[in-house]
């Protein structure tokens, strides 16, 4: 798999994809490069996904991040699609490209650009105005994608997906016409790989007799909303408990038993919804409970995915399976369900066994040929095989799940896995008795009646090795047995000289055989050795450029003499030396707002009705699509006015605060969602605020209002839910009807580095208080914790220096903690990048990942916190500290990411 410049053919039949007429089981992980704003780390994530068994990545490309204005499409810097696709090809991963135009993906407006909220045309239909913009976007993406098509030898783009994966109802002709137009546009742009939409393969609706089975998203976690109602307030830690290895194994084995051969794990790596990128329902972390966590760390549920990924990649029998028998059957013990499949070409048989009870079951499986009872853990599932070729020998049956089978050098290697403490048993068909060497003390074996029987307790002593030689074949077979934890240290890798298998390190990133030296790169966490089964001719081994003395072990491997040391302890600095400055001068009646936009429109494309007789106050209509928005209303004579009712519309956890002549009137915020409202995209409310009697006077008065809109809802075809108003909707007064002249101001024009989602309309953002080069020497020096009781905005800044070694890959987070009764929010800016929003009294997120590249691992860093408090309680920050999430010796070279410009 490479960009070789040659022509290739991609097709499918009812069994699988056909790549150059060879069957392929696609094992794809969804990855969001836009949620990792450090392009160097894209390679790190891709290498980890490939090493853990994935052969493809499913890549959404969000229109909104790339298009700050109509007709403008930016693919530079952290938006460099060409770089990502090139890196994926270099890392030997196929790409399923998903340019939308609508994505969902818990993105602001589902991935539709902010400017589209104020434009004519009904989204996701055949409306000509919408299609004009959508086709222009697809054309911009396709101009890059066409250079990376696998069919043309330019890259590894193997499949192309339209829209968000949802099917189109048959009774919605506008939506169906819209999909057909998008498909025609893609084909006109010379995209000649198979195209999928929400109904399956485009042109062959769904999975039918002529189409390969497609799984749109098997397992991989779930999004968690503000407040964490579904997770009990525990956030993604709880999501991981639900989507554990057992859950992931059951989901994927069910898909395999259903003869699915195009698998999509949604989520492989989620990342961080930095800035104002997230949809209204979700908070900053998009960890998702994915198999690769937000901090780029493999999660415990990775074990199940890795084992099956390597299995479908190295055992071609699984690319063509037919149902054998009459569907699911109960075993002799009715607590087990067995699905029986077979490959009609090779005769290999596969059994998927489910235990639907809450207790371990050990029982025989009549009719499978497996001659001993099989153990399946509580609620778990297991894939067993019989009649499977292991290189030059045949597996009669096994009670352990096969993980891989390769031929390397002058030997075959097969790996079998199971839960810790289980006993793995297998039998090989052997007409003549073979020789057997145990490289470890745990395995036992016996030969009788033409079969070699091997029994191994899994997990005792780590990896167990059995060498089978002579007998029916001159080619030795190395049998390896591992429990889940041990299997996570087994790394197969394809090289031009042939496949190899490495055991020991935390990660294998690359392997290259030059002359007689095998050059390995990867990561080491704990003290470990290195063991290699590889092609012929290996005389020497290096690890990350350093020679590794080896000897030939009893299992025909090269074994490191001694051990590589564990990664050294990492010390992170305390955060002190804080500087402080209050903000929101916009609430002062004397503030100069003459350069602000007059809110004088009377019509809107919003789905929110314009109040009768009132101006349009919706922020989007004035070009302010992301982040905080300020309003200032001038009026004459407030005598008799007892209160003001401010109607506003936001996403989840939006808020409004108001001042009259600089005097705080109060704050209103949307409620914390429960499980029933967690998916609600737009929230509306009216803040009824009393006017102090001393402010009910003649003369000019200024009503200042700050709204935090919290992003736009996604939309179904034809609904235009993303066009619901954000910001103020109307203002009404009790006791009078003053004429109000409104002015509005939000975020400045997007700058080059970060694009449209980094900043909103806070005064400090517009003045560059978040930037590393801002001069804060005149700011007040303070210590944390703080307890300011003030309605409005305050900023805190500090600097810290890291001196991590060049061979160290450390994942670092920022942790904020305080009394949960205190009502305030914090925007976190690192070196100018808006890396998240912390809501102290809502949660559930307290630790925010600081991506290397934006974080200077060997240099000075500037941290700025913009604190928005409602004045009802003391407001922090209280505890702010750096947190080490993980550290290994290895990693990838990391280029510094530019800080945003003014």
Task: Describe each PLM feature range.
Residues 1-56:
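N-terminal carbohydrate-binding accessory modules
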Residues 25-29, 57-59, 95-99, 158-162, ...:
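Hydrophobic faces of well-ordered beta-strands that scaffold small-molecule active sites
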Residues 41-108, 183, 187:
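Aromatic-lined substrate-binding rim segments of carbohydrate-active enzymes
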Residues 83-86, 93, 176, 181-194, ...:
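Catalytic-core region of carbohydrate-active enzymes that cleave or remodel glycosidic bonds
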Residues 274-316, 320:
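Aromatic-rich peripheral "rim/lid" segments of glycoside hydrolase catalytic domains that contact
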Residues 302-856, 862, 868-902:
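Non-catalytic C-terminal accessory domains or segments of carbohydrate-active enzymes
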């Amino acid at each position: 798999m490479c960009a070789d410049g040659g022509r290739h053919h991609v097709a499918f039949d009812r069994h699988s994809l056909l790549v150059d007429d060879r069957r392929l089981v696609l094992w794809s992980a969804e990855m969001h490069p836009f949620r990792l704003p450090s392009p160097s780390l894209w390679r790190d994530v891709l290498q980890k996904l490939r090493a853990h068994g994935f052969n493809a990545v499913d890549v959404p490309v969000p229109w909104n991040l790339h298009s700050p204005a109509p007709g403008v499409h930016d693919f530079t810097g952290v938006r460099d699609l060409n770089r990502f696709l090139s890196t994926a090809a270099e890392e030997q991963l196929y790409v399923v490209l998903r340019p939308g135009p609508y994505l969902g993906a818990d993105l602001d407006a589902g991935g539709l650009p902010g400017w589209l909220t104020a434009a004519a045309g009904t989204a996701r239909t055949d409306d000509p105005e919408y299609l004009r913009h959508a086709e222009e976007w697809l054309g911009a993406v396709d101009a890059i994608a066409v250079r990376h098509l696998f069919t043309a030898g330019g890259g590894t783009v193997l499949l192309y997906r339209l829209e968000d994966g949802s099917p189109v109802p048959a009774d919605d002709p506008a939506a169906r016409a819209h999909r057909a137009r998008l498909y025609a546009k893609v084909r006109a742009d010379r995209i000649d790989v198979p195209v999928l939409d929400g109904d399956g393969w485009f042109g062959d609706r769904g999975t039918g007799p002529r189409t390969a089975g497609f799984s749109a998203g098997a397992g991989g976690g779930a999004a968690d909303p503000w407040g964490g109602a579904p997770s009990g307030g525990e956030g993604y830690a709880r999501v991981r408990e639900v989507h554990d290895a057992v859950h992931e194994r059951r989901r994927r084995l069910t898909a395999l038993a259903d003869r699915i051969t195009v698998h999509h794990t949604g989520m492989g790596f989620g990342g961080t919804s930095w800035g104002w990128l997230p949809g209204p329902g979700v908070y900053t972390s998009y960890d998702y409970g994915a198999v690769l966590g937000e901090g780029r760390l493999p999660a415990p549920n990775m074990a199940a995915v890795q084992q099956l990924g390597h299995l479908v990649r190295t055992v071609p029998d699984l690319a063509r399976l037919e149902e054998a028998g009459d569907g699911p059957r109960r075993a002799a013990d009715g607590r087990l369900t067995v699905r029986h499949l077979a490959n009609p070409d090779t005769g290999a048989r596969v059994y998927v066994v489910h235990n639907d009870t809450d207790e371990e079951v050990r029982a025989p499986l009549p009719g499978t040929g497996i001659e001993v009872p099989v153990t399946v853990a509580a609620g778990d599932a297991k894939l067993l095989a019989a009649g499977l070729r292991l290189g030059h020998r045949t597996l009669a049956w096994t009670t352990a799940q096969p993980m891989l089978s390769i031929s390397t050098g002058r030997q075959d290697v097969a790996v079998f896995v199971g839960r810790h403490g289980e006993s793995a048993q297998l039998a090989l068909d052997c007409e003549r008795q073979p020789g057997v060497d145990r490289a470890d003390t745990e395995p036992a074996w016996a030969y009788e009646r033409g079969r070699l029987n091997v029994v191994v307790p899994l997990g005792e002593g780590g990896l167990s090795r059995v060498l089978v030689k002579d007998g029916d074949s001159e080619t030795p077979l190395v049998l390896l047995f591992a429990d889940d934890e041990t299997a996570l240290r087994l790394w197969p890798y394809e090289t031009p000289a042939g496949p190899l298998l490495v055991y020991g390190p935390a990660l294998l990133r690359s392997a290259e055989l030059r002359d007689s030296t095998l050059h390995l790169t990867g990561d080491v966490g704990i003290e470990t050795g290195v063991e290699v089964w590889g092609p012929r001719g290996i005389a020497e081994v290096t690890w990350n450029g350093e020679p590794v003395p080896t000897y030939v072990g009893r299992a025909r491997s090269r074994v490191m003499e001694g051990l590589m040391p564990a990664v050294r302890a990492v010390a992170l600095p305390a955060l002190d030396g804080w500087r402080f400055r209050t903000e929101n001068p916009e609430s002062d009646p004397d503030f100069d707002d003459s350069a602000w936009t007059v809110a004088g429109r009377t019509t809107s494309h919003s789905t929110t009705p314009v109040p009768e007789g009132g101006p349009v106050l919706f922020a989007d209509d004035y070009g302010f699509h992301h982040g905080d928005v300020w309003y200032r209303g001038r009026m004459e004579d407030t005598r008799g006015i007892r209160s003001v009712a401010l109607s506003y519309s936001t996403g989840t956890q939006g808020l409004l605060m108001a001042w009259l002549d600089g005097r705080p009137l109060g704050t209103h915020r949307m409620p914390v969602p429960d499980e029933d409202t967690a998916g609600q995209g737009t929230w509306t409310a009216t803040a009824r605020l009393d006017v102090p009697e001393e402010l009910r006077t003649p003369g000019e008065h200024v009503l200042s209002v700050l709204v935090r809109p919290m992003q736009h809802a996604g939309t179904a075809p034809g609904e235009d839910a993303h066009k619901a108003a954000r910001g103020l909707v109307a203002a009404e007064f009790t006791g009078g009807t003053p004429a109000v002249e409104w002015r509005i101001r939000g975020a400045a024009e997007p700058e080059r580095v970060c694009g449209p989602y980094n900043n909103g309309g806070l005064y400090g953002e517009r003045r560059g208080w978040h930037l590393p080069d801002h001069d804060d020497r005149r700011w007040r020096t303070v210590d944390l914790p703080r307890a300011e009781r003030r309605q409005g905005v305050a900023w805190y800044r500090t600097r810290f220096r890291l001196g991590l070694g060049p061979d160290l890959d450390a994942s670092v987070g920022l942790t904020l903690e305080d009394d949960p009764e205190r009502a305030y929010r914090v925007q976190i800016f690192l070196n100018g990048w808006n890396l998240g929003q912390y809501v102290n009294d809502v949660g559930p997120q307290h630790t925010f990942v600081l991506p290397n590249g934006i974080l200077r691992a060997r240099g000075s860093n500037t941290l700025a916190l913009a604190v928005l408090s409602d004045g009802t309680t003391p407001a922090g920050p209280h505890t702010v500290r750096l947190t080490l999430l993980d550290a290994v010796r290895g990693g990838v070279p990391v280029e510094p990411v530019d800080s945003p410009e003014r």
